[in-house]
């Protein structure tokens, strides 16, 4: 399988997960805007660092691959919100944390 096919497979897996979670949570990710999504991305990065550094997975059935898929989806969610806000998309306004 070449890299393009690998990417398609990853994106399909991520889309399936997004559809399932969207059915459960709806548009909740948009509640706190881009900053909220960035905070969730930070949580997932810290989780991935913990898993790789300590080799410990404290959440059953959610390993490094699952965390990477979540990061993929959170990045897509942030892009959705950026597309909805042209000023931020064009970097014409500052985003304060």
Which residue ranges define each predicted feature?
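Intrinsically disordered, low-complexity regulatory regions
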Residues: 1-97
